[in-house]
Amino acid sequence: MENPITMTISSQPPKIKYLTNKDLLREIHLSKNTYCSFISPDYSEYDLILPNISKINVRTIAEAKRNQAIRLSKRAHESAVLTGGKKLPAKEFEVDYKTIKKVDVVFRIMTFEHIPLAPGRKKTLKNTADSHDKVNFPPFQHWKFDDNNNLIPVGKSHWKGDLTTGEFNKEHGKMTNNLARMFLKLCERYATRGNVRGYTYNDEMRGQAILQLTQIGLQFDESKSDNPFAYYTAAVTNSFVRIINIEKRNQNIRDDILEMNGMNPSWTRQNSGVSNFSAGTGASSGEGGGDWD
């Protein structure tokens, strides 16, 4: 008797992801760390963002413990899935936040205390940032409890060297290569949208968007939102619209000069005149009717 023929159905190919907020947040975090100084690399990760030290209390400590437990659980689950090559229930890797010690929690405090003052930088001071030296992203400090239950600083942004003997520095860091690639991919993908891909100056719009992202890419504030994709998409949209408006204004000036010299303007100007006439009278389009007052 012949052996039966067995057929194996291959699983569906993995879904190709475009950009996720999780990946963007990770690269933003790594990029900002290059501008920071920490007592230990372990303190570069934070569990909770607060506006000032006075907000650290029993409630915020418990919230920070929960956040750290969630992060450790996800990290253990992802590592097990990569190692085993198969899906595993996430509940098996859950970490109880009550097992996390108080001294293991790190707080990110948004503050300008370590940023030098810059009197005269702006005439009218609207916020705290206007009275300090300009930096490329909101400054912060990392704090934690020591064994004596005292809060101590363990990290500073825009800082080089030791936390006590070091100095302010905002030029020694850089953006990660992965974040730069994400910006390029975001602009490339946006440039293929139906409402912008037909423009002859599509490359100029992409270039302006990339330039804008390199300038404001790290200004995303994690304490206000966890959706950097929307933040960057809005910046890219504004850059594209800006170039479109500039090109339209230049085209209008060129058409005005051509008409002043008795020459035919661009087809866009001519077609806009026909459409305006049609909208005003309804005669050219064949729709509607009525007399032209």
Regions found by a protein language model. Name each.
Residues R189, N238-I253:
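Arg/Lys-rich amphipathic alpha helix in sigma70-family domain 2
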Residues W159-L163, G207-Q212:
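A short glycine/small-residue-enriched secondary-structure motif
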Residues R193-Y201, L213-A235, I246-K248:
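Short alpha-helix-to-loop micro-motif enriched in aromatics/charged/Gly
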Residues T214-E222, V241, I246, G262-G273:
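Short, charged low-complexity intrinsically disordered segments located at boundaries
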Residues N3, E204-M205, S225-F229, R249-L258:
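Short, glycine/acidic-rich hinge or "gate" loops at secondary-structure transitions
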Residues N252-D293:
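Intrinsically disordered, low-complexity, charge-dense segments enriched in Lys/Arg
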Residues M1-Y201, T281-D293:
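Extreme N-terminal regulatory/targeting segments of RNA polymerase sigma factors
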